[in-house]
Amino acid sequence: MARIAGVNIPDNKHAAISLTYIFGIGRTRAQEICAATGIAPTAKVQDLSAEEVDTLRNEVGKYTVEGDLRRDTTLNIKRLMDLGCYRGLRHRRGLPLRGQRTKTNARTRKGPRKPIRK
């Protein structure tokens, strides 16, 4: 297994699909990385040479991925909550942020139903 950005990517899959195992890299960005490095997206990772894996590693290093990206998103949410803006309050209460109705839906965001206490 090749290790890129702290993630063991699977050997038996295509290079473009294997790159999507890294948090912050989806199908489109994986295709762009393969095009930039000159590696065929359909090439299996186990068939790549060590130099090709190094070029992939260097190209992925240009993007914000994995721990840095997770930290950035949590800090952005924390900043909204500290500001006390509408989106921050919705994050704090665990409700939808983008104007969805909450009277009947939003069960995923609100969690399981709580019984009515008398």
Curated annotation (Swiss-Prot):
Its Gene Ontology biological processes? translation
Gene Ontology molecular-function annotations: rRNA binding; structural constituent of ribosome; tRNA binding
Please list where the region (Disordered) is annotated: 94-118
* Any Pfam family matching the protein: Ribosomal_S13
Query: Per its UniProt record, what PROSITE patterns does this chain match?
Result: RIBOSOMAL_S13_1 (PS00646), RIBOSOMAL_S13_2 (PS50159)
Which keywords are on file for this protein? Ribonucleoprotein, Ribosomal protein, RNA-binding, rRNA-binding, tRNA-binding
Q: Which Gene3D superfamilies match?
A: 1.10.8.50, 30s ribosomal protein s13, domain 2
GO cellular component terms, A-Z: cytosol; small ribosomal subunit
- State the family named in the UniProt similarity comment for this chain: Belongs to the universal ribosomal protein uS13 family.
Query: What function is annotated for this protein?
Result: Located at the top of the head of the 30S subunit, it contacts several helices of the 16S rRNA. In the 70S ribosome it contacts the 23S rRNA (bridge B1a) and protein L5 of the 50S subunit (bridge B1b), connecting the 2 subunits; these bridges are implicated in subunit movement. Contacts the tRNAs in the A and P-sites.
Question: Could you give the subunit structure recorded for this chain?
Answer: Part of the 30S ribosomal subunit. Forms a loose heterodimer with protein S19. Forms two bridges to the 50S subunit in the 70S ribosome.
The name on file for this protein is: Small ribosomal subunit protein uS13
Q: Which organism is it from?
A: Chromohalobacter salexigens (strain ATCC BAA-138 / DSM 3043 / CIP 106854 / NCIMB 13768 / 1H11)
Q: What is the lineage of its organism?
A: Bacteria, Pseudomonadati, Pseudomonadota, Gammaproteobacteria, Oceanospirillales
> What's the gene?
rpsM
